[in-house]
Amino acid sequence: MRRFVLWWREGENSVTGRCFDIGVATREALTDFHRTGKLAGVGRGDPNRAGNGSLMRLAPVALFAAPDPDVAATLAELQSKTTHPAVVCQAACAFFARLLVEAIAGGDKEEVLRDRKLGERGVVGAIAAGAWKTKTRETISSSGYVVSTLEAAIWAVGRSDCFEEALILAVNLGGDADTVGAVAGQLAGAIWGRRGIPPRWLEKIAWRERIEERAMALLEAGKRPSRATPIGLISSSGHRER
C-alpha cells in the first residue's frame, strides 16, 4: 500500500512522473490508508464498488507465482483486498490469476480457456464455466464492472487467433476500453508470448527495457524458496500475522 501511495502522491513508477487516471475506488482506498495506516475495506459488499482496478494490474502477481495456480490465486485475492475488497473482485482476480499462470507455463488458448468448475458461484463461476462463449458483439459488456471487464477480455482473446487481433477486438468494444485492453493484453501476452506482440507495438512502449527487466526479475524471484513469504505473513483475513 505504501508503494501505491507513493505512485498516487509522488508519481513513483509512473512514466510521466505523476499519477494520472486513478480510479475512484483506488483513490478512496489510498486516501484512507494514507490517513489511517489501515486497509479500510471500502465497498466490501457493495456491487456498485466492484470496479476493475485490481484486475488490470494482476500480471506481476502471476509472474511471481508461476507456475503454481493456487499461490497465484491466493496472492491475487490479497492484492485485490488492498483497494478493491469486494468479494466479486477477489473472485475475479483469483480466477484470472489461474488463467495467467497456466498460460505462462505454456498452456495454449484452448487449454487455458477450457470450461472450468472452480467452486465459484455466481457471475465469476459462470464465466469460468464458459458462459462467455455464448456472447456476441452485441451482448458482451465492456463496462468498468469487474465481471464485465473479465468476461470481455476473455471473450476477445477466445475469439482471436493472435495477440494483435485480440487487443484490437478488446479495445474496440468501447466502454472502459483501456482497462479491457489491459486485461485482455495480460491474457493474450501470457498465451502468445512476447514474440506474439507486433514489433511495431513493442517499439512504442515507454520504459520497455525497464518493464522487461522487472518481468524477468519477478519470474526469477518466484523460483526462490522465500516466494511463499507474502502468504505466510498475511492471514486469510488480510491482516499481518505475528
Regions inferred by a protein language model and the residue ranges of each:
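Structured, active/binding-site neighborhoods that engage oxygen-rich ligands
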Residues: 1-242
